[in-house]
């Protein structure tokens, strides 16, 4: 879907502080369930992340939840981009919900084996991943205003139930082996220990932006499945 650059430029000048004239809109082409674009102005760069057009599964593509959690983590040890604005209704140039965040120039590694770097660098990258994950799970959800971000109760049961429903809504044919997998998962759910922490939901190497010259993570992305 092509975006009306003139209309979007006028809209963002109203809603994003210090937004100047929009020069170009470039769609990121790799692995985005929510369409994501780089916006280049005369003075800066931004990222626009939107719900896809058309009919969507209930609770899928929750860019408003992404915006909320990224904004809440702004002053924590978890590296996230700055967010500037959420268009939380359809009365905008895209006709669907989207948000604007900071563009972070850095490195993204798509292959988990990271063959393009040496062993020491690879070790450093994965150490940074472990550190950010520990920082995330140490966030006090009450202090950052996310006490109501997730639903109460057994997380494992909720996740299993959610994905079973998503599968059954979107399946095309009967798959007996999938029913066996579902039964196995439902019979083997771990007991909920009552501990609560923030979960990213899609924590993997290519959802992170690394500093250009070090193994430091400068931005953890794609919070669509966070809870």
Q: What spans do the regions from the language model cover?
A:
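Juxta-kinase regulatory segment immediately upstream of eukaryotic protein kinase catalytic domains
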Residues: 1-23
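Tryptophan-centered motif/residue detector
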Residues: 10-11, 163, 184, 223
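Aromatic/pi-system hotspot detector in well-structured domains
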Residues: 11, 55, 203
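ATP-binding pocket architecture of kinase catalytic cores
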Residues: 22-180, 184-198, 212-214
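Active-site Asp-x-Gly
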Residues: 197-198, 204, 210-227
